[in-house]
Amino acid sequence: MNLSLISVLFLHLFFPLQAMAETFLPQDPGSVYDDLTGDYGVLGIASQFHVFAKEKTTINAHTEGNVATGVLSATNNFGTSISTGDLNKEINYAQSVKTIISSAETAASDKRSNKFIVGSNNVITTENDKIVVNGTKLDHLSVDEFYQDREDAQYIDFNKEFENLMLTSNMLMSLDPLKTYTPDDFPDMNNRVIDCTNLVGDQPYVINVTASVLAKNTPLRINNPQEKVLVINVVDAPTNFSVQSQIQYNKRSNHQTEDFSDANISWNFGNLTENLEINAPFQGTIIAPCTDITVNQSQDGTIIGKNVILNATTNRWDPNEFFTETNTHDDTTDTISSSTAPSTSESSTAPSTSESSTAPSTSESSTAPSTS
């Protein structure tokens, strides 16, 4: 055996060749409205994602749900792992992938397909029939499930969506509540209950809660036996606000699910709070389109914010849709209607009649979120 052959064998033994990445042009994803064709109410397509962040999502803990974000920094896994047949497709979108781990997203099955989209600025290759995003191979996604924006188009126009979400948040704040709760309504701090049993009306229940109620460190229980859609406006919140109250809803515990039929509670924090921390287990969708949201305890529901940081396990729980008219609290007519059917959650085939509410509100000033 000559010296050259021995040298080659030695190099292969101790320095095995790395698999060569191959250049790859993913499929054109089209528009989110090609995939989400239902009418999802005033929250629009945002309600079909666990996290919907205009600027950046930082995932530091297991995230049981899908993400749509400007920038993704994920040092932990994400994706809805439970599969019982209720959710037939899961979509993720990141315009710029800063960090992602190989185990991101849950592998497709005969019950669910995946669509994973990234922006045009990301470097995409393949290795052993797996997608490689900016140098990280994704083990749970096939080549056929991966898509990339073209330079002249974006799968989701976050500027447009968040303009609508800001209007929606203002409009919800303007609605006349059935009741407003302050700390004085809870004389027993260890037994704080918002009971919706005797509330009446065809429209979903709109309730105001002062931020000082959520600043207390004892549980707040929401009883909603009729499973009406609840919109809870958090009023008088400071610029920087921490939720210290555990939210208990209909004796439900935080858990993984793809059954969203009971997801009937949304918390609207408006557009004026800049920083929001969730420091106790929380249930319900968070509407805070201009806010940096940090979740430090378990949370179930959609999270809508400017920037979102997840430091604790969170679970997808898409809200049931509800719809609004342009009437404000100055009118005596109904302002909201809701669906009593389970959430459509990306499986709806009904054509959409509107993308989201565009009715402006005068009750709370709206400032454009930072793009920095």
Task: Go through each PLM region and give its residues.
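Classical eukaryotic N-terminal signal peptides for Sec-dependent ER targeting/secretion
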Residues: M1-F10
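Intrinsic disorder/low-complexity detector
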Residues: S4, F14, G30, H329-I336
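Hydrophobic membrane-targeting signal helices
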Residues: F10-P16, D39, G44
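N-terminal signal peptide
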Residues: L11-Q27
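Long, polar low-complexity repeats
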Residues: E22-K115, L167-N327
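A generic, well-ordered mixed alpha/beta core segment in the N-terminal half of proteins
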Residues: A104-K137
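Hydrophobic alpha-helical segments and helix pairs
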Residues: I131-P183
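Low-complexity tandem-repeat tracts in intrinsically disordered regions
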Residues: T333-S372
